Amino acid sequence: MSGNPHDRYIEIQAGLAQTQYECLPMPPHTAWEWLEAYGAMNAGPAQIHGAWHGAQAAVEARLETLIPQERLEQLLRQTRDTMAKRPAQALFCRGSGWGALENLRRAHAGEPPLSPQLDFGVPGAEQAPWRALLERGAMGEYDPREPVSSWLPDARYLPLLAQAAQGAERENWHTWLQLGAALLTQGRFADARDALARADSLARCAWVKYACSCLHLMQHEPERAAVYARQAAEAAPEDASVLKFALRVLLEARQYGEALRLIAAAPPELQRLPRVRLSEAQALVGLERLEEAEAILLQDGGLIVPDIREGEQTMSEVWLALQQKKYGLEREAAEKIAPVPYRMDFRMN
């Protein structure tokens, strides 16, 4: 699966849907249970590598002799009460505090807790402002120079946020920011704009500018989004994530010169980040500075961007845009002359 014949790699994936591209809506208060078994099996090559339906039937028949389906169902029934619903005797790893926060919210609302047999611990530092909101009706002070520790797009917190913002925390930029972000996730753009404008008036803060940029992106206003994204990066010049976000927004708005100026103003250690170098190459292609862009992409045997996501096509798109302009050809013809290098091609097909 890695694409390199010299790499020994196997990946096991399982789920209820047929493929990764599908999803199954899960109704509230529903439990889905299943049991999986993994192991080796032998079968005749002629059967396994023959027609699909025949191969499928051969594998199913062989598996039925190794571990019958009814045996799996029996094990599932047996373990439902003896294991799945039994409180743990030893805790090996503590998870995040979000489950604990939800149990706290449920207790305040008079609702039953999450799975009572599970130990969700207590809310931690990330959940501290939300715990304070539940218990005291106020999130408390927050340093605008520090990254926002958490966001909670849960409509059930909206009334609490609104009450705090209109009352005891009317001068608290962080409460207004969280209210604006929550409204944004609910599609209430006009209300979100008002809340974020209030937050922006209370503090010069990268995270407020970031949220304002997201608002304008969602409203298909790339130029306004770019203004706030640039301001966010200027307010947090040492933050790599803000710089990467700002560059993406500027490039989407085709403000290539602004993107290069932002990179030039960044600290050297951020300028050298592979994702920033990729954005620089993209901006250079947009400005027809093709040799400079190609030099970045091909440096040291080819640019490697560790934080690129599976299926993300940014690298291949930048490469092909460069080749189209370089040769003056349509995309397909340019790719025949200069195919996307192996190290840059993350396309799924």
Stretch-by-stretch model annotation:
Residues 1-24, 30, 84-99, 103-118:
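A contiguous, surface-exposed recognition patch within enzymatic or periplasmic domains that forms
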Residues 25-42:
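Short Pro-Gly-centered flexible turn/kink motifs
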Residues 169-170, 203-204, 237, 271, ...:
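Short coil turns that delineate tetratricopeptide repeat
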Residues 174-178, 207-211, 241-245, 274-279, ...:
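Alpha-solenoid helical repeat scaffolds
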Residues 268-274, 282-308, 334-338:
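TPR/TPR-like (Sel1-like) alpha-helical repeat modules
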